[in-house]
Amino acid sequence: MKSSDRAPLIRAAVLEPFIQVADRIGTPVERLLRSVRLPSERLEDAALLLPETACWHFIHSVVAKEGIPNFGLIAANAVTFPDLAELASLTHGCSNLLDVLKRFCVVAPLFTNNALFVLEGTADHVWFSQKAKPLLDDYAQIHLFQVLGMIQLVQLATGSPASMAVGWNHTDAVNVFWANPASWMAT
């Protein structure tokens, strides 16, 4: 089966930070989950596969209802390092950040079958990129969550690197955040 023939699926663990933050701010989470045809009960099984498009529709519904345009960043920031226990195991046996990133590129499709993380570079620089086409180009939350998640992975492995450049493909949905990326990266 070609990858383009597969239904895009994502683990419940990826949606959970969005649910937690939405719940904290008083969003009617269960109602919004039902409205996009996702299970309305708490997703106890982090490995449960969910339709990815429905998950992003849920997140978009929270953004529209609560008027929080950077909700994807807030949710990604809500994921603390202890919550990244599954990712922390990536660092075992790796001698450097490059090894961690290589391993992540291999295991990322276990969390979403729409992921295509790659490493490109020269002898002096490495670019860590998400090459898969976003399911919904006009949903900024997808881009914001992915970029901050990638930053957090680097921080998990290195603490705070001496330098890190951040960028993404400019689309109308995310250009509003590009003027000052430091303003949304601050924790």
Please tell me what each predicted stretch does.
Residues C94-T187:
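Alpha-helical bundle regulatory/interaction domains
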Residues M1-W127, S163, V174:
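N-terminal low-complexity or simple alpha-helical regulatory segments
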